[in-house]
Regions:
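Short alpha-helix plus adjacent loop in nuclease-associated cores
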Residues: 69-77, 228-235, 262-263, 351-374, ...
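A basic/glycine-biased coupling hinge at the interface between accessory DNA-binding modules
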Residues: 1, 6-9, 19-194, 218-219, ...
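Conserved Walker B
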Residues: 7, 192-203, 207, 227-228, ...
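Conserved helicase motor core of SF1/SF2 NTP-dependent helicases
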Residues: 9-12, 201-280, 284-289, 403-406, ...
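Helicase P-loop NTPase motor core
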Residues: 12-15, 78, 250-253, 258-348, ...
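Conserved helicase C-terminal RecA-like lobe
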Residues: 138-141, 321, 335-347, 360, ...
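Conserved phosphate/pyrophosphate-binding and hydrolysis machinery centered on Walker-type P-loop NTPases
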Residues: 36, 88-92, 108-116, 138-145, ...
Length: 564
């Protein structure tokens, strides 16, 4: 079943009621239902609504994102693929660090092969389920592509050595698992007899294949989407998945939801006018019973700073509650002038897509300790904290450890265990041994049931000397960083209290999968500044579209590439 759901047409309500209908009217075991959304925030909202709607068994319904679903499956079965189940999930910064190591190992010229471009090629390959070996085979006769393929191979080797996966691996490895382990696939086909997918227009080839495999046995598949809202092609989304749904799943039915409950007719008329000429779209016209509503206001200004000032002054003069206002723009670079105006007029604001909380140095440091405790093979985590805070293990000693590890096919942590065997370490060997003792002590404590993540973080901060080093940096700096660590402790405490069988690995997984938008609290009285891509699916009373000009909205690149 394909539900073509226009914007604001109540698609989440449809999915929630379908789940309730299956459980209460059709006596389907909730354990056999899988509902996939695209953000943790959407998954949480759907889970809450299912709980309100269904009178029993709602907790057994598996509601999560594609990535969370795959992580849960891989945590149980990834040993079939040669990994350990306590694998680490690498974020973008971690990927960049690994790529720098790969370039060094292979002596790659970063001017000829820009890291960012190569990482994009690898990500696209994984979205298309192309392995390094297949990439190399396809690259025959093209020296540039052959080099990219070899970089891809070495990158994957480094990840596996660290017992780590990147985001794109999560889905690709799950598909690989299902294709190579029929018994595992059969288990999940039996488990998930009723599958529902939200935002289907945003799926890529790997996600399509995952759904195809899971639904292959019982074919009880319901997807909800809107080809008019397909805005993630730059992330690998394939609009063909929704446009060709009836061809991919024979006998499929299509239902259209065209009544909009969110907007006024004037807004819908403008949207319909813009979208109606899209190539290959499925025909539908949104309508509403909300009335015509006010006309869309258009304001022409000469300079970007004038535009920013106009928007902020307008919010002030109209007296709008700040939390009901959002300013949307095409690129993150446009936020600077808007931020400056908010500061000048003393308007509280939140910037979605700014520095992610989990990317802050002190947070990454503490998480690196936790990752090392969880997965000693994670060389990135170990390398980050081996001398943080400073404990007298300098760059020369670390280089000797790294060389020894590579020569003996050891992880960095394993090499540290053998510090006494490595010549030239001198006094650093004792300091390395004390670091190992600290980590092993924490591992021992984590085996005690009563020892919580809150205690672990507090003990890491105190016993590693992290707090003391922060305080040496200055009172103001220490206070700010400790406040952030306090927020991490709050997050860990909430997870610990709200989870049935909490584990360190699952907490790290939850943190690694969190997106910027998941942390958005619309109840805070602040003006929201965000890109259009971040705003998808959100609602605000007052919306300002900035930078509606030639070459910017849509971008010059989109026009030239023919993607419009």
């Amino acid at each position: 079943l394909l539900v073509l759901a226009g914007a604001g047409s109540g698609k989440t309500r449809v999915l929630v009621h379908r789940i309730a209908y299956l459980i209460e009217e059709k006596q389907v075991n909730p354990w056999n239902i899988l509902a996939i959304t695209f953000t943790n925030k959407a998954a949480g909202e759907m889970r809450d609504r299912v709980n309100q709607q269904v009178h029993f068994g709602a907790d057994s319904v598996w509601v999560s994102t594609f990535h969370s679903t795959c992580v849960r499956i891989l945590r149980r079965h990834i040993e079939f693929l040669g990994y350990e189940t306590n694998f680490t999930i690498y974020d973008t910064d971690d990927q960049k660090t690994v790529m720098k190591q790969v370039y060094k190992i292979m002596d790659v010229d970063s001017k000829l092969y820009k890291e960012r471009d190569v990482m994009a090629h690898i990500s696209n390959a994984k979205d298309e389920l192309i392995t390094p070996e297949e990439y190399l085979k396809n690259a025959q006769g093209d020296i540039h592509e052959q080099t990219v393929a070899k970089i891809y191979q070495e990158y994957q080797r480094c990840l596996k050595k660290n017992n780590a996966l990147d985001f794109d691996d999560l889905i690709m490895k799950t598909v690989q698992l299902f294709r190579t382990q029929p018994m595992v696939l059969d288990f999940y086909q039996e488990r998930f007899r009723y599958i529902m997918i939200d935002e289907y227009q945003d799926t890529n080839k790997a996600q399509f294949e995952l759904v195809h495999l899971l639904a292959g046995k019982y074919k009880n598949l319901c997807v909800v989407g809107d080809d008019d809202q397909s805005i993630y092609r730059f992330r690998g989304a394939d609009i063909g998945n929704i446009l060709n749904f009836e061809d991919s799943f024979s006998g499929a039915k299509v239902v259209k939801l065209e009544q909009n409950y969110r907007s006024t007719q004037n807004i819908l008329d403008a949207a319909n006018l813009v979208i109606r000429n899209n190539r290959g779209r499925k025909d539908k016209t949104l309508w509403t019973s909300n009335g015509k509503g006010p006309l869309i206001h258009f304001q022409r200004l000469d300079q970007a700073y004038e535009e920013a000032e106009f928007i902020i002054r307008d919010i002030l003069s109209k007296g709008y509650p700040y939390q009901e206002c959002v300013v949307l723009y095409r690129t993150n670079a446009q936020s600077r002038l808007l931020e400056e105006q908010c500061i000048q007029f003393n308007i509280p604001y939140r910037l979605v897509g700014g520095v992610n909380f989990y990317q802050r140095k002190e947070i990454k440091d503490i998480l690196a300790y936790m990752k090392t405790i969880s997965n000693g093979r994670d060389d990135l985590a170990v390398g980050r904290i081996i001398n943080v805070p400073k404990r007298g293990i300098g760059a020369t000693s670390i280089a000797k450890l790294t060389t020894f590890a590579a020569a003996n096919n050891n992880s960095l942590y394993d090499a540290m265990h053998k510090a006494g065997e490595i010549s030239g370490l001198g006094k650093a060997a004792d300091k390395i041994s004390r670091f190992i003792e600290l980590i092993e002590d924490f591992r021992g404590r984590m085996k005690q049931k009563e020892y919580s993540l809150r205690q672990l973080i507090e003990d890491i901060v105190e016993e590693s000397g992290y707090r003391a080093e922060l305080e040496n940096e200055g009172e103001e700096e220490a206070e700010s960083r400790m406040e952030n660590i306090g927020e991490l402790i709050n997050k860990a405490t909430s997870y610990w209290n709200d989870t049935k069988n909490p584990t360190l690995e699952e907490f790290l997984e939850e943190v690694s999968l969190v997106a910027d938008i998941d942390q958005l609290d619309q109840r805070e009285n602040r003006v929201t500044l965000m890109t259009l891509h971040s705003a998808k699916g959100l609602e605000f009373e007052n919306v300002y579209l900035s930078g509606m000009e030639e070459g910017l909205f849509p971008s010059y690149m989109a026009v030239m590439s023919g993607d419009l």
